[in-house]
Amino acid sequence: MEYSTLIARLKTASESFENLEVQLADPDIANDPKKLESIARERSKLEPLVIDFNKLLDTDKEIEDSKNLLKENRNDKEMESLINEELINLEECKNQLIQKTTIALLPKDPRDERSVMLEIRAGAGGSEACIWAGDLARMYERYGQKIGWSVKPVSASESDMGGFKELVISVKGDSVYSQLKFEAGVHRVQRVPATESQGRVHTSTATVAVMPEADPVEVKIDPTDLEVGTARSGGAGGQNVNKVETAIDLLHKPTGIRVFCTQERSQLQNRERAMEILRAKLYEIQLKEANAKERSQRLSQVGTGDRSEKIRTYNFKDNRTTDHRLGSNFSLEPILAGQLDEVIDACIAQEQKRMMEDFNNDVN
């Protein structure tokens, strides 16, 4: 992006920020809590960008002053050296601010701030794939707890040999989707199963779908499209276990999506959870259809959410995790312990780089 174009866009953002501050001082808006909260939120989002814009303007002024000072001290070698050193530092600071503000101006994914439903399904590999699905669930649970998110299983189909055939986890918190969306795809494991007597390495897979939570307004479900059944729950519930039908079996007839929810203690709670999962699944379908054209035009695999996409291999023998999108290796043990920051940050950086290239092409 041309520097003049960047400055023009930053000025527009600064003007919007000033306009929001004027609105916040308006008594009529102050008496409307919902509108006040919305404007305050928008102002809060713009404030860091405006601060960096002002820093950029100040840095430009300092560079100009230093260059003028350099002209005045051409005969003073010591002063000239000091000014040149200062100019190098100022130019470096300017470049950092240009990159930071350009990234901040990139189009935002409106779903990034949402909580998610994380669906993990055992893939190829039989019982070992189910065990692997359970390992992935624990990895995400540890990661979420470390950040301070609320992580709770809402639907599970356990395997007789351990682990899960399918597991849906609710992850609630700030900007959950912005981090976990990079986990969507096929996760492959290479290791010797506990049941393997010959010590041979087996390859198994599990798929992860990351579905941003949807509001009822965004996904309207016709009650006549639902087939609702009940069953006795095998989960927590004390004396209610196997006596009261608290589990909910929900079928969405137009799509064939089935949700079986047993984790809550009451039938009403399980129904609410099942509807929450169904909305997220239907919302994911809507998003995939809406973005199909864009995805076909982009070769990048980052953030596509395509379940057929192999994104990562976990090799136990070599204690190595390979992220195929990044072409980078990471130590296995920290990753499984929930220390995903390094790999997710790298995915974010890769996506930002791709978006900056697209952004510059659009501008030019």
UniProtKB/Swiss-Prot annotation:
Modified-residue entries (N5-methylglutamine), positions: Q239
Q: Which GO terms describe its cellular component?
A: cytoplasm
Keyword list (alphabetical) reads: Cytoplasm, Methylation, Protein biosynthesis
What PTMs does it carry?
Methylated by PrmC. Methylation increases the termination efficiency of RF1.
Compartment annotation? Cytoplasm
Gene3D superfamilies, per the entry: 3.30.160.20, 3.30.70.1660, 6.10.140.1950
Question: Where is the major localization of this protein?
Answer: cytoplasm
Q: Which GO terms describe its molecular function?
A: translation release factor activity, codon specific
| Family from the record | Belongs to the prokaryotic/mitochondrial release factor family.
Annotated function: Peptide chain release factor 1 directs the termination of translation in response to the peptide chain termination codons UAG and UAA.
Q: What is this protein called?
A: Peptide chain release factor 1
